[in-house]
């Protein structure tokens, strides 16, 4: 869902419809929440996360590895000037990502926030925002990482 939301935003679509992907049985109802824990399903979490970025200005940047290997998106909030880079690691191994262009030139230190898929693939684990050196960041396996400038 994260990659699809990024593609929607890159294409200029500022709103998307939600459909849950997980259900409790073959003929069960797909829910927005896990009935046992009351937590949002991963798909619901992704929609909630990206909802804060929809409608923002897309900005140009360079990133390594290439977007085909690590889908990414950079946005700027016109009201606050705050920029965010989103990187999606769909691999089962850690990836070192380098950021360049307007994003890298802006600050020496950045804030990094990461959401990691749990081992059972049923929930997103949130790593709190932390400070990091600008230019490079480690992307955990199966994670969605935001770099804020």
PLM region descriptions:
Residues 24, 93, 120:
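Surface-exposed, flexible loop/turn segments at secondary-structure boundaries
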Residues 124-126:
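Short linear proline/tyrosine/threonine-rich motifs used for host-factor recruitment
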Residues 6-10, 75-77, 102-104, 136-139:
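A general structural signal for short secondary-structure junctions and capping/turn motifs
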Residues 67-106:
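Carbohydrate-binding surface patches
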Residues 128-149:
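C-terminal beta-strand-rich structural cap/linker in extracellular carbohydrate-active enzymes
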Residues 102-122:
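Solvent-exposed beta-hairpin/edge-strand motifs
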Residues 17-21, 62-63, 87-89, 99-101, ...:
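Active-site proximal loops enriched in glycine and acidic residues that flank catalytic Cys/His/Asp
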Residues 1-73:
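Aromatic/acidic polysaccharide-binding cleft in carbohydrate-active enzymes
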């Amino acid at each position: 869902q994260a990659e699809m939301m990024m593609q929607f935003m890159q294409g200029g679509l500022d709103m998307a419809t939600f459909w849950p992907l997980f259900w409790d049985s073959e003929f069960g109802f797909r829910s927005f929440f896990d009935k046992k824990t009351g937590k949002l399903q991963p798909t619901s979490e992704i929609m909630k996360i990206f909802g804060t970025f929809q409608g923002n200005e897309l900005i140009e940047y360079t990133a390594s590895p290439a977007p085909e290997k690590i889908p990414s998106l950079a946005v700027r909030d016109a009201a606050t000037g705050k920029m965010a880079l989103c990187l999606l690691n769909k691999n089962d191994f850690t990836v070192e990502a380098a950021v360049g262009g307007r994003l890298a030139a802006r600050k020496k230190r950045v804030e990094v926030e990461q959401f990691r898929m749990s081992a059972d693939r049923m929930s997103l684990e949130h790593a709190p925002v932390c400070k990091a050196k600008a230019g490079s960041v480690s992307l955990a396996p199966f994670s969605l990482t935001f770099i804020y400038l």
